[in-house]
Amino acid sequence: MEKIDFRNKINWHRRYRSPQGVKSEHEILRIFESDRGRIINSPAIRRLQQKTQVFPLERNAAVRTRLTHSLEVQQVGRYIAKEVLSRLKEQGLLEAYGLSELTGPFESIVEMSCLMHDIGNPPFGHFGEAAINDWFSQRLFPADAENLPVSQDRCTVQTLRLQEGEEALNALRGNVRRDLCHFEGNAQGIRLVHTLLRMNLTWAQVGGILKYSRPAWHHGPVPETHSYLMKKPGFYLSEDQYISRLRKELQLDTYSRFPLAWIMEAADDISYCVADLEDAVEKRIFSVEQLYQHLYDAWGEHAPGDLFNLVVQNAWDKSGTNQLHHSAEDQFFMYLRVNTLNRLAPYAAQRFIDNLPDVFNGSFNHALLEDDSPYSRLLELYKNVAVRHVFNHPDVEQLELQGYRVISGLLDIYSPLLALTLAQFRELVEKESVRSLPIESRLYHKLSSRHRLAYIEAVSHLHPQAADFPVWEYYYRCRLIQDYISGMTDLYAWDEYRKLMAVE
């Protein structure tokens, strides 16, 4: 069994311009303070204030955005991290685990991973993701690249269509098509941090947001030992070399996860399950009395002293005693949040410690709050009530359908750039305006300079004479469009769609 020594995991070096030499405890903490500054001041964090949590295009400031949600996750992550360190200290294990001088970085990595955990999410959340993946799947037919005869390949892009006698190129074409049809917020977060924003964070800090270990182009069954860790795509083909280096620097096996990412995940689970219900009451989807009844009914069999009684019933009873001086609604959610956090955060911390050998080597194939305990049951209760009574509400569904249409429509609008030949697009990139391509020139001008530069740099590392050059160029061109549209806020995407569709 691998010896647990967090000095081998909390790697304070960076991909570029990394600090050199032996560092003191204070110097290492300053390196992670630099990470905090880079993250908090990044435009990706600022954009979270206009991205959806549950309710798109919400004007009520009391309803959560991705930013306010992420701040709450950050606080819960800090609580769990401190609880882990406190319990290890009580057991006299901080020094044995190499943490005696790394408690500050441990907490900071968790906090900043929590703050960043949603930065890759597109406008309109999961419906934005679905719109991107459906749009590309309807053109690239990724499944056709796996086992159909070449003659039956339905891919509409000539460059990516399988060709007889080109086995090596066909393998790349298949990988590219699968990769582009598996857009995922977590994978986009890795791309943002490394490729688009070039934040040059420490290896440990990036490890904290690598939630899933499955490559986006992976096909076939996943190893049973890593089925949970590979539940979703975690990174793209464009970041493959970077992730390979990250694994080496953090001493992670293939498909393994960085230990502190489990805390980030638990903090997110605890935060959003109560927050979604509170936002639904704020939106008047149901009253607090109706919510209590939904929770009571969904719990099933009740017993004195069970977790429902200690958390939900306790919050309900207390909220009814102060109605003269406080809003019962506010009181209920205050007690519900406090009760939930005070039960689930210590439990998550203990699960982290109890499974530390597997967590440390990155192979623990579960979430911390995913077991057959009452704590997991409470979390599932909140999630199930939200699914049943919030996410399927007509107002929510209508906004999600609108969001799906907006993202699909924007991809349609920018698709002429993907229809250009390699020679035409290269000319457009070099000249920025081509008289014979008036529409495409104007669309290209609208793309963010940051995303255009990322495309130009990626293509500059390719060899134009190589047989695979057209495939890679088209891949990075698609990434350019996905980067631009997924980087929009909900409001910007909505306005852009209406303008370009000449709705106003």
Curated annotation (Swiss-Prot):
Signal peptide: none annotated. It catalyses: dGTP + H2O = 2'-deoxyguanosine + triphosphate + H(+). Its EC number is 3.1.5.1. It comes from the Bacteria. Its cofactor is Mg(2+). Pfam families: HD. InterPro entries: dGTP_triP_hydro_central_sf, dGTPase, dGTPase-like, dNTPase_1, HD/PDEase_dom, HD_domain. Keywords: Hydrolase, Magnesium. One of its GO terms (molecular function) is dGTPase activity. dGTPase preferentially hydrolyzes dGTP over the other canonical NTPs. Belongs to the dGTPase family. Type 1 subfamily. Homotetramer. This is Deoxyguanosinetriphosphate triphosphohydrolase. It comes from Cronobacter sakazakii (strain ATCC BAA-894). The gene is dgt.
